[in-house]
Each structure stands twice: as C-alpha cells, then as structure tokens.
A protein has these predicted regions:
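Acidic beta-to-alpha connecting loop that harbors the catalytic carboxylate
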Residues: 117-119, 145-147, 155
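Catalytic active-site module of serine/aspartate enzymes centered on a nucleophile-bearing elbow/loop
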Residues: 154-180
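Conserved beta-strand scaffold positions in the cores of enzyme catalytic domains, especially
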Residues: 15-17, 83, 140-142
C-alpha cells in the first residue's frame, strides 16, 4: 500500500494511510468490527481536518476497504464522495459467498472495486452480480492476471509496476468523474 500511496500522490491524489489498532499492536487477530469501523470514522475525520478543501474518497486494501464500506453503510461518512476498494474481500479463500457484500446496498456514495482475476478472495463470477445489483453506484475495474495483492505472474509479461500504474490511472479517472 505504501507504493500505491506514493504513486497516487505523484499523480496528484493525496492519501492518508492508517492502521487498525490490532495491526499497530502487532496482533494477528483483528479487532471487533465496531473497533474497526470506529477507526475508519476517525481516519476520515482526520483527513477532513487535515485537508478540508480537497475532495475526499475513502477506502482501502482488502479488509480496510470492507471496513470502510461497513462504516459507510452505518451512515454517511462526512465529506466522503466515494469509496475505493483495492481487492474487496468478498469471501474467504475457497469459500465462495456474497454474504460480505450484503451491507453494500446501504452505501449511498459511488464505489470503485479494483479486482484481479486471480484474487482468491473475490470470485468475479460472484462479484459482477453484486456490482450489477448496486447499479450506477458501483464500478468494477478488473485487472487481468492480478492476484489479491495485485501481483502478476512473471510469465504474464506484465510487471507489478505496470499494474500499479493501471490502478492509479483508474482511480484518478474515476475520481475525476465523481468530482464533476
């Protein structure tokens, strides 16, 4: 995520990175959902305070994105114009389900889902209908050959750096449309 944040910044997209308490404390077991969503809300408030004049989009990688969506489903996140998910974890590995997406119908801002075709935590055959159900609020951008961390197989001929640039360009273009 650090490289992604750096590349987004280079493209003119400011980022605020944060960690959940369990990560800060180097624990393996995640905090309770209430703690995770409260952390998201606190991070959004900090971003608004630090950069009140910038357009604000919230999101994250994997569980960070899912917890951001859960916080947004509980009520609007002040100042947030849209949500960006880098590898939305739709289900645990090898246990396909859409239950983790049930709350997304309560999110009221546009959502960008960035997913790799080799993502073990999001079967695209399940994610596509989830996004379709969300209608114009959901945009799905698929990265051919990328895994959950957006890494590519060497034999693909596409570098991780190229994928990173693709993600940055997609986020920038999508955010520009939302700001209009």
């Amino acid at each position: 995520m650090e490289n992604l944040a750096d590349e987004l910044a280079a493209a003119g997209v400011a980022t605020l990175r944060y960690q959940f308490p369990y990560m800060e404390e180097r624990r393996r077991v995640p905090d309770a959902p209430a703690v995770l969503t409260a952390t998201v809300v606190a991070a959004v408030r900090a971003a608004v305070k630090e950069a009140p004049d910038l357009p604000l989009f919230a999101g994250g990688k994997s569980m960070g994105g899912r917890m951001t969506s859960q916080a947004a489903a509980q009520g609007p996140l002040d100042g947030v114009r849209g949500l960006v998910f880098f590898g939305f974890p739709l289900h645990p590995p090898k246990r396909p389900s859409t239950k983790r997406a049930d709350h997304l119908t309560k999110v009221t801002v546009p959502m960008l889902f960035l997913q790799g075709t080799r993502d073990d935590l999001a079967d695209l055959g399940l994610l596509r209908p989830v996004c379709a159900k969300l209608g114009p609020l959901a945009t799905l951008s698929v990265v051919q050959g990328a895994d959950h961390s957006f890494h590519m197989l060497k034999r693909s001929g596409t570098s991780d750096t190229a994928v990173l640039q693709q993600l940055v360009q997609t986020v920038g273009s999508w955010a520009a449309k939302i700001r209009e």
